[in-house]
Amino acid sequence: MAKNLKLNIKNAQIAEAINLSGLKSKLAKKKEEESTQKSSAAKSTSKTTKTEVEELPKEEAPRIRARSKSAFAEAPADQSSKEITEEIKTSQDEESISREAAKVIEEKSRMKTSAEIRQEIFGEELSQAPSKDSSQELEFAEKIKTNETKPTTFIEPTIASPAPAEPKSLVEDKTSITHVYQNQKRDIPIRESLPPQEKLGPTGKHMRDFIKPKPQPERVSRPLEANNSNQKEVSEANKEKLDKNKIKPKSKGFEEPKVLTADDDARKGLKSPKFKEFKDIKPARKPETRQFDARDRQGLRTSDEDQHWRKKKNKQRQNIQEDTTIRPTSLKVRLPISIKDLASEMKLKASQLVGKLFLQGIVVTLNDLLEDETTAQLLGQEFGCEITIDTAEEKRIQITDKSIREELQQSPTDQLQLRPPVVAFMGHVDHGKTSLIDAIRKSNRAAGEAGAITQHIGAFRCHTTVGDIAILDTPGHEAFSAMRARGADVTDIVVLVVAGDEGLRQQSIEAIQHARAANVIIVVAINKCDKPNFNPDNVYRQLAEQNLLPEPWGGQTITVNCSAVTGEGIPELLEMLALQAEVLELRANPSMRARGTVLESEMHKGLGSVATILVQNGTLKRGDALVFGLLWGRVKTMHDEYGKELQEAGPSTPVEITGLSGLPEAGQEFIVVKNEKEAREIANVRSEGARQNTFMLQQKKKVSMENMLQQASATGKKMLNIVLRADVQGSLEALKVALLKIESDKADLNIIFNGVGEVSESDVQLAAASKAIVLGFHTQIESHAEALVKQLGVQVRLHNIIYHAIDDIKVLMAGLLEKIAQETEKGKAIVKATFKSSQAGIIAGCQVIEGSIHRNNYVRLKRGQEVIWKGTISSLKRVKEDVREVQKGIECGILLNNFTDILEGDIIEAYDITYISQEL
């Protein structure tokens, strides 16, 4: 049905285009005048054509869709019909009626039906229209081939692309078909057939518009005259192609686009463009075949029905880039390592590692460090990576994992030599340790000490009758516990000095514990045997209580009665020390690299960092490179206890050295390395590791001055900030420990900075900014910092004795506490009457019933049991005289300060306020 409707529309368009209705009317008039010799074929043809034209509706043709196969979809029908009508009129004027009459008979035999004309012009297939038998169609086609003459020529234009052609190319070659009806001749121009309209896409263009043609060889432009001369040959060639197309049914499949040549450009009057080479980026699509569906079964689909609306739009596929990262299956890392660095090594995102650890209950951030070897390895297994810990750098910076004793055990016996014993004198304060050492050395060291107490660890090399002895003098004060522990660690023998008149005290017992912890032999020297109240049996009993059974009581602990003042018992003490050293067989290897311990360190004004060290094994030479924990150094100078310069120091020799990068902590071990460069590298790596550890601690517990002040204010405690300065590292450590032992529920101590050396400008500025007090121990203020102290008003406290410094700090902490107000009752008065005064207000007429009321007393007004008001007395009068005090039983007038709500019967109580200082 739809096919027939389209054919009817096309017939109407053809009839309107060639003005077929006017021609038919003229032909009908001519046919009536013709003779009876007309053939039946012509009559049937005219009747068929007439009936078909008459049956066509004369309505306006409906709008043709853009995708229709009609040739008139490309060009307006009105324009083409006007051109054809004008040509028909001109041809009618030029040709005469006589020429038509001569060829009437010839044209009668060649008359065709309108359907055949449409098939010739448009090449359409009339599958559904009524048609003749196939044999008749073949005979008619052969007849058309034989009867075609030169006046009728059809030229198929060469189309370069499926885009609409220009209007002037719609009719390229116009020929005249001569018809003679009743001695009348007329040339009817036949419109050139156009290819059927291709189906267009949603953009209004065919797919071939987007396909670039293949590059062709360079075109050769021909002159226009040559093209005109060859026009006949082209027409003949096109006619042969048209003949073939009449027989062969037109294929509806995909057609390759025709390449436009230079001849075609010349024929259209176009200039030949420059040749541009291009590539076919997007290949042509294959023709899509439609499946047989339900509409085909029901006969509802036509062959040319548009299927584009059924096609789903191909969504643009997102260019998903595949992850081509090659992740390692094994990895060697060095601990500690941050999460970010580990993720970079594993070629992963840091968030992946953080997520895995979070699932295991470990909350970390990108910059957190992993220190646990097991955690790092398990994390690697989660991502298929085997992680091993690189310990090569640790071993390098550790230098050696063997202790001094293990090195000596592995050394050849022929290289080992006897060394002097290292003896530490320990005991309670004021029991005579330093005096006993002076008696052995025949010196007067104790006289030069502040407060007659030792506050530094001293190291000496003594030459005695029994041989050389290295002596360490340790402080006996309770604050110097760490010093005593260090002395016990590096010594071979501990001499416990006990005053015979006092016995064992707290620090004496502590010294015994340090010696036992260090597994050191203890020799007890009972001092002060020259005093009348000397009682060695009491000391024996106390030693037995500490599991040190003395020899006089059948034990193994050696005891010697001696006196530092008279020198009694000192030779026996030296003999016992030599005997113990012989029993221990103390040996060392002088040919090895030097190793030892830092006993003390201080900041010298001219020499910089100075350290007192004890060489325990090997030989230290001037110029050697050392490593002290995080510091390094190169020995520039080396002196003994007398200030004598040395070139080398053997085992069991205490010396002072300079040339250090910083101030080493007391108790640190040192070791000699190959050169200064290696020492610097090792110290830098250690410092970096320590810095990372410090950063981790700060991340876990962020502490700042503001936070501490807020915490102190939240708990209601006062805070005393202190900047500490001491002459040596050991004294600084002892002072810091002693200060932190001060306990109080009302005030706290905060050491914001501590260092070795003199009080500097930076210390004063820091104290001023943090409202702190500068405490110096055995040190002074720098000359250029004194003016700054006065300018900023900073308190600087300098002390030489440690317990004086501690007592001073306690007083300062107590001064921070607010004083407690205490009220003392003075007297009472009862209000008998009230008087109004225009100037003063209400005056209370009172009688003192208890004590006395003074003019400067504080008063409170009570009404019943409730205190109504507290304040001061503005005026106190007796009759009309101002008085300072009113005694019991006397009437007076009292004017309260800024209070007038006084009633008869109120009681006025007088009291004084005293402020009492709090204790820690």
Curated annotation (Swiss-Prot):
Region of interest (G3), ranges: 473-476
Region called Disordered, residue ranges: 27-112, 143-325
Residues binding GTP, per UniProt: 427-434, 473-477, 527-530
Region G2, residue ranges: 452-456
Region (G4): 527-530
Keywords (A to Z) from UniProt: Cytoplasm, GTP-binding, Initiation factor, Nucleotide-binding, Protein biosynthesis
Compartments, as annotated in UniProt: Cytoplasm
A GO CC term attached to the entry: cytosol
Cytoplasm among keywords: yes
Entry-linked CDD domains: IF2_eIF5B, IF2_mtIF2_II, mtIF2_IVc
Biological role stated in the UniProt entry: One of the essential components for the initiation of protein synthesis. Protects formylmethionyl-tRNA from spontaneous hydrolysis and promotes its binding to the 30S ribosomal subunits. Also involved in the hydrolysis of GTP during the formation of the 70S ribosomal complex.
Protein family: Belongs to the TRAFAC class translation factor GTPase superfamily. Classic translation factor GTPase family. IF-2 subfamily.
Protein name listed in UniProt: Translation initiation factor IF-2
Species for this entry: Protochlamydia amoebophila (strain UWE25)
Source species taxonomy: Bacteria, Pseudomonadati, Chlamydiota, Chlamydiia, Parachlamydiales
Gene: infB
